Amino acid sequence: REIFSLIFTNNVKPLTKSVFLNLRLPRVLMALISGAGLSLAGAIYQTIFHNQLASPDIIGVSSGANLGAAVFITILSSSIIPTALGAFIGALLSVLLVLLLVKGTKESNTSTYVLAGIVISSAAKTGIMLLKYFADSESELAAIEYWTMGSLSSITATKLLYIAPFSIISMVILLIFNRQIQLLSLSDDEALS
């Protein structure tokens, strides 16, 4: 009832308005953006790998992102910009490593990518465990744990403004290239016609 009053009449207590606008709304919006991004990433992986069970962790992207974030947390800080940048770099490096591993083989089919992804994912998880072992137990270890578990509890309007534009722009770009991505699900003969 108070949210309804806030949206339509603006006849609420200042504390209620502050809690809604500064705590609840940024978390809800971040949950929507995260969910949309994850579902889009999952759909793209399912298209590329011709497998309805495929997800971003199938070629080590999730583990690489976690390792990148953990490295940046231990080296720089646990603030949102360096951590997100570290996660992006880690995910990108894991994809590049998978591509390099597959390039060195005789065949480059879906199974080869998955096996290379398992190798990269295992290596990244080992790196995360080492970083946790050597991390400062007061701050770094907790920050790494919270990052790997995932939580929206620390999202504020400021953090949302940092993250949302990159996420939304990335999703729009992927949707623009939807036709080309869908062509990946076709066989070579079907794609040529």
Task: Report the location of each language-model feature.
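Alpha-helical transmembrane segments in inner-membrane proteins
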Residues: R1-S193
